[in-house]
Amino acid sequence: MSTAKLGCPKLRIMPLSIPSFPLPDARGRYGRFGGRYVPETLIPALDELEQAYEAAKQDPEFLDELDRLLREFVGRPNSLYLAERLTEHAGGAKIYLKREDQNFTGAHKINNCLAQALLAKRMGKQKIIAETGAGQHGVASATAAALLGLSCVVYMGEEDMRRQSLNVFRMQLLGAEVRPVTSGTATLKDATNEAIREWVTNVRDTFYILGSVVGPHPYPAMVRDFQSVIGEEVKVQLQEKEGRSVPDAIVACVGGGSNAIGIFAPFAYLPEGERPRLIGTEAAGHGVDTGMHAASVAWGRVGVLHGSMMYLMNDDEGQIVPPHSISAGLDYPGIGPEHCYYSVMGMAEYVPVTDAQALEGLQLLTRLEGIIPALESAHAISYAVQLARQMKPEEIVVVNLSGRGDKDVTEVMRLLEQSENKQAEGQEVKA
């Protein structure tokens, strides 16, 4: 029996036209943030990309094909799930999970990768390159490349390859070449550096699929637009479940910030008083006072990285301070320019969550709901429980569960065993 006969409304994945937002301005800026800080050789490529994107998002054929693939290949719409036992544990507001972990490839990254790969093919490019930290963007890029018949090279820090060996094999199985990066801290920032270097060299036939809302214009806007399907679905699904389209608060983890912007942006420009609290959880690592963290808003200063002005973790001489996070996907020393604008304008809050709190959040959701979240998402879960506890039962918190935790199980096992060994040693010393 069709959904039409059952009287169920069809939830279109992409609107008839991609949502338009007030920012960026014509120079690609969000207030003082964003812009294009790149070599002259890249300006024509960025202009070409911007023109191609503007044309594509007005093209019904492009939108219909993206809509079809998001439905039939990715599996959208995914669930807006009431976490009843987690809600009961918190003892306050209802906690809903936006289940990006249900997407094919296991995270929100595929929303953007599939769209950019379609754009690459439309532009006549034959090869895509990508950077990856946790490996999810790399897997999604390799998946989109395999689907559309494009070659794919993924740059990944050597340290992240160790932490995410399963995703490395997935990329290789999909036909991608994974190139290890050993420079710097051998993590996401360094992988991005190498990907940009290759793009500069091979810009004629190569398309760079940037995975987050960072980089030079038009990347932050383009990635936001492709990820905004998350927030647009929440509006429709919450209306069906609760009779209202706007929750009281939305919580999402933030590294560069693509999953967070995807759920924030459709709500961020609502008038004050109608806008929900938007809360991004940054990776506080061992604590923001230790220097071992990746909390760019809490600790950073304005600077330029990867072609964009943003809050950065830099020292008095302007040098990048190596970030740290238990999660490879949050291990980035900056945050996207639109998030910086939200913070300055008071449109969103950004709070630090430590490694230990994220591990607790992961175990809590796993044991109460049977859902193993990605370590990145666990930062948001941890804070959402604290937040819900302070709210009223009739209020609603939506958490963007940005990805599943399969990729992290080996690392979590190692960390928990390490913690247990330390506790045992401490008990023996006390004894």
Swiss-Prot record:
Documented EC number(s): 4.2.1.20
A GO MF term: tryptophan synthase activity
SUPFAM superfamilies assigned to the protein according to its UniProt record, in alphabetical order: Tryptophan synthase beta subunit-like PLP-dependent enzymes (SSF53686)
Gene Ontology BP term (one): L-tryptophan biosynthetic process
Enzyme class label: lyase
Pfam families xref list: PALP
Cellular component terms (Gene Ontology): cytoplasm
Protein name: Tryptophan synthase beta chain
Organism: Deinococcus radiodurans (strain ATCC 13939 / DSM 20539 / JCM 16871 / CCUG 27074 / LMG 4051 / NBRC 15346 / NCIMB 9279 / VKM B-1422 / R1)
